A protein has these predicted regions:
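Hydrophobic membrane-targeting and insertion signals
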Residues: 1-53, 57-60, 74-77, 235-240
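N-terminal beta-strand/beta-hairpin edge segment
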Residues: 43-123, 127-151
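Short amphipathic beta-strand and strand-loop transition segments with alternating hydrophobic
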Residues: 50, 135-137, 164, 214-217
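A generic structural micro-feature
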Residues: 60-62, 155-157, 194, 208
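Hydrophobic membrane/lipid-contacting segments
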Residues: 83-92, 133-189, 223, 228-230
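Small-residue helix/turn framework positions
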Residues: 97, 106-129, 163-197
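Extracytoplasmic/luminal low-complexity segments enriched in Pro/Gly and acidic/polar residues
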Residues: 186-240
């Protein structure tokens, strides 16, 4: 009799213990990807990878981190070729998740974000936020070159304005630092007068998930925005 009971209970116990370990990561990754896709209205489902270290901790709903990667997507008012969120450690309610069939997290996810903004998008942002006409933008490793025009003695000359991207009050800004007009380097004092009003600002307040951008860096052909994401809700909440 005992052998029969053991033969019945053992497979059940194995399923109870191994089931969450086997299916929970895929279920959670799918739920996160589906939620991000739906909330952002993007065409392609993002890549999601979640980690638990050691792996057995996921049975208690404890995850050490993970990442969410989106490619060629519109993040509010900025188009990115790639956006990556590195997740902070988080917990989920394992049994509520298994019972409901969708993820039940104890708190929204959070993490650090890096956004690749391509040169053509930087050019679009510059044109949208500038008071002067801009023909083109060249993003280089050591800064940004904006091609425009300056007015000297009533005549307009092609100009290359050198500077660096930065942040101020939640806006992406460009601060001019040097000027070349008609192929000639303009002295700093004159350049300061000619460059008055040539800086541009572009708001970043429409990024999803209350994202806060705290850093910007120019690289060859792109700028990198970095910051934090404080709240990425999942499919359901306890009692929800």
């Amino acid at each position: 009799m005992r052998s029969v009971v053991a033969g019945v209970l053992l497979p059940v116990l194995v399923v109870v213990l191994i089931g969450p370990y086997t299916f929970l990561p895929s279920l959670l990754e799918y739920a996160v990807a589906r939620d991000v896709k739906a909330r952002l209205g993007i065409e392609k489902q993002p890549y999601v990878e979640l980690k638990s270290d050691p792996p057995l901790r996921m049975l208690a709903g404890e995850f050490s981190g993970g990442r969410i990667v989106m490619k060629n997507t519109d993040l509010g008012n900025v188009t990115a070729t790639r956006a990556r969120i590195d997740l902070d450690p988080f917990d989920i309610d394992v049994w509520a998740t298994m019972r409901k069939g969708q993820v039940v997290d104890r708190d929204p996810l959070s993490g650090d974000v890096r956004v690749d903004v391509p040169e053509w998008e930087v050019s679009r942002l510059a044109k949208a936020g500038s008071e002067i006409p801009i023909q083109d933008v060249d993003v280089q490793k050591d800064g940004v070159v904006v091609r425009s025009e300056v007015s000297v003695l009533g005549r307009r000359f092609p100009a290359s304005i050198e500077g660096e991207p930065g942040l101020r009050d939640g806006e992406l800004i460009f601060q001019p630092q040097g000027l070349t007009a008609a192929g000639v380097q303009v002295p700093d004092e004159l350049a300061d007068r000619l460059l008055a009003g040539t800086s541009f600002e572009y708001p970043l307040d429409r990024l999803p998930y209350q994202t806060t951008i705290t850093g910007v860096e120019a690289e060859e052909g792109r700028i990198m925005l970095s910051g934090s994401v404080p709240s990425i809700p999942l499919g359901a909440y306890p009692g929800g």
